[in-house]
Amino acid sequence: MEEQPECREEKRGSLHVWKSELVEVEDDVYLRHSSSLTYRL
């Protein structure tokens, strides 16, 4: 019973890392897409 909170914290931490990584990837794709658009213009 005492081990549950630790597992929950671990999951929340990994989820936070996953979210931040996803945001970084989205930003990278967006920047690359916008730069290619400006390059075409």
Curated annotation (Swiss-Prot):
Tissue distribution: Expressed in acute lymphoblastic leukemia B-cells and Epstein-Barr virus-transformed B-cells.
Entry keyword annotation includes Disulfide bond: no
Effect caused by changing residue 16 to R: CTL recognition
Region described as Loss of recognition by cytotoxic T lymphocyte (CTL): spans on this chain: 9-17
The entry's keywords: Adaptive immunity, Immunity
An annotated GO BP: regulation of gene expression
Keyword Cytoplasm included in the entry's annotation: no
The protein's role, per its UniProt record: Precursor of the histocomplatibility antigen HB-1. More generally, minor histocomplatibility antigens (mHags) refer to immunogenic peptide which, when complexed with MHC, can generate an immune response after recognition by specific T-cells. The peptides are derived from polymorphic intracellular proteins, which are cleaved by normal pathways of antigen processing.
Subunit structure: HB-1 forms a complex with MHC class I HLA-B44.
Official protein name in the record: Minor histocompatibility protein HB-1
Gene that encodes the chain: HMHB1
